[in-house]
Amino acid sequence: MPVQQAQNTQQNGFAVYVEQRPAGLVGRFVITIHHLVGLLFGGAFAFVHQKKALREANTLEMLLLRFSLIFIWPFMNKQLIRQPFPVQFRQRLEMLGPTYIKLGQILSLREDLLPKAITDELKNLLDRLPAVPFERFQELIETGLNRPVETMFLWIEPTPLGSASLAQTHRAILTTRQVVVIKVLKPGVRQTVTRDIVLLRLVGQILQLFLARYQPARLINEFCRYTLREVDLRFEAENAETFAANFKDEPDVRFPRVYKEFSDHDVLCMEYFRGLTPQANVVNKLSRQQKERLIELGVGATIRMIFRDGFFHADLHPGNLIIFKNRQVGFIDLGMVGRFDTQTRRRMLYYFYSLVMGNPANAARYLTSMALVSHKSDVNSFRRAVEELYQRWLRSSNFDDFSLGRLILESVALAGRYRIEYPGEIILMVKTLITIEGVGHMVAPGIDVRVASRGHIQRIILEQYNLGKMLRDSALLVPELLDLINRSPLALNESLQTLESQLKQSRPDPLQGVRTSILAGFCMVAGAILVAFGSPWPFWAGLFLLAFVFAIKS
């Protein structure tokens, strides 16, 4: 059966995507520099205009700046330059194309680094962009999968489900009758993004020389890592399979099945979720019990992703959450994910647990332990400021306005004042928590997400630290412990030889540093022997801790 053809080249409400040959590296460099210089002078003009409005424009420096702007005025975009600087910034990112739109969307989350006026404006970046014509969309499928569309699909809906900066999606029906979503990269996007990333990394290194406090090179490298994965749709397929495996024991939380036989670098075919988004009016008509069940599933799934798995949806918004008729919840659009290593995930778990249990001092301590600090950082002042912020939240009598996600974001945003930074994954995690909290209030206004989170966090704590799991984790260390037992006599012998050698030397204190070495070796050997004989873990854990302390002291 032939695939249904498009009847409307206007894309039914979408502007038509004008396909152009991607500019080369030199071309993109010229375009990028043009907008960068334009933004620089636009910022200077906005600064002068602001000072003039405040009657502060009569200083010598301001007069010189105004005089210099006269010479470049004929070359400026008059309509754009008269806008406030945050608006200029957003519009120039949109002009530069998909890479910079994605960059702006990431920067909109960095309230810890950028002024609020800029982050608020960047939240207005376009998310409904021109769509590739339907005939061209089918050609891209055939090129990507190297076979005619009619051999794979009975029908493809001409109207796009969505058209973003990098890709476009349509609903379709496979020849095997399953309803699916086809996601296709827009033509030229990968080449443009790859060239832009080369230039962005160069710009990041240059900005690092002048704005080292804001770590532009690190921020841009983080962004480049995320974006390169988004222009290879195989990564999104892997993400969907990882999420499904992590939640295989939770049938009420669903992730779309990927049809790998119809997927490649540029094409992704996945299960279509027929359901409602949280904004739908039908959701408001559900009973209180049904709403609480949905919130329980959504909040529980999000907390589980972050604090148990360390692998979470990093582009969550209400449109990416699906509510099914049988009151299950589904997550879609899985191209952007965040990952925590074991140590960070554990600290995040302790931090969040302290928050929901109302322990500001511990929460501030664990939040500080995850920060990126330098010799210029004022860690103690930051910790005190965070603790005071938590105390104010806890004293608040109006818990209807209590936003746990906003509290975390405000805490992280304080870091910039004290020369402290946080990894991008933590900012993405905060955005995910804010989104799921907002969805909770959308479905059931007035819900206290802190209370809803408490049971899930306590469950994860119990799972992570029950005796059986600790014994299994300890068993993984058996080879290292056996090796330690074998090497301990030699280490002890070497320590004694060192002691004998130092005793023969004429020193004011020949035993300095050696006593602790012997004690460290003794504790290590004793702990290893206790492990070998199956003694309870508190006994050998304490000995290993003492060995570590003595070793550091020596």
Model feature map: region roles:
Residues 172-173, 316:
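Conserved beta3 strand of the Hanks-type protein kinase catalytic N-lobe
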Residues 538-548:
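Hydrophobic core segments of alpha-helical transmembrane domains in multi-pass membrane proteins
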Residues 171, 178-186:
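Glycine-rich ATP phosphate-binding loop
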Residues 319-323:
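Hydrophobic residue at the +6 position relative to the catalytic HRD Asp in the kinase catalytic loop
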